[in-house]
């Protein structure tokens, strides 16, 4: 496992606070949303993978905005039978 430093990541992210936000969003995408890592996982945890991607310049805020903009699932429309249950009288 290669050591990743904050200074290496700051070449691609404006400041440490943005690094935390971008890194956590990307780690969450990898861990829970099924997004594929852009680097070989090498048995690393999602947070380390995210920082490695940032260190290599593969991830930035614009990339995250583009990958988060996925279509929203539509909810089922209420049927006539259940319409009375939606808005009960007071």
From Swiss-Prot:
Residue runs in coiled coils: none
Entry keyword set: DNA-directed RNA polymerase, Nucleotidyltransferase, Transcription, Transferase
Chemical reaction(s) catalysed: RNA(n) + a ribonucleoside 5'-triphosphate = RNA(n+1) + diphosphate
UniProt xrefs under InterPro entries: DNA-dir_RNA_pol_omega, Pol_omega/Rpo6/RPB6, RPB6/omega-like_sf
GO molecular function, one term: DNA binding
EC supergroup of this enzyme: transferase
SMART domains assigned: RNA_pol_Rpb6
CC per GO annotation: DNA-directed RNA polymerase complex
Gene3D superfamilies documented for this protein: 3.90.940.10
Its EC number(s): 2.7.7.6
One of the GO BP terms on file: DNA-templated transcription
UniProt similarity note: Belongs to the RNA polymerase subunit omega family.
Annotated function: Promotes RNA polymerase assembly. Latches the N- and C-terminal regions of the beta' subunit thereby facilitating its interaction with the beta and alpha subunits.
NCBIfam families: rpoZ
PANTHER family noted in UniProt: DNA-DIRECTED RNA POLYMERASE SUBUNIT OMEGA
Subunit architecture: The RNAP catalytic core consists of 2 alpha, 1 beta, 1 beta' and 1 omega subunit. When a sigma factor is associated with the core the holoenzyme is formed, which can initiate transcription.
Protein name (record): DNA-directed RNA polymerase subunit omega
Record lineage: Bacteria, Pseudomonadati, Pseudomonadota, Gammaproteobacteria, Cellvibrionales
Name of the coding gene: rpoZ
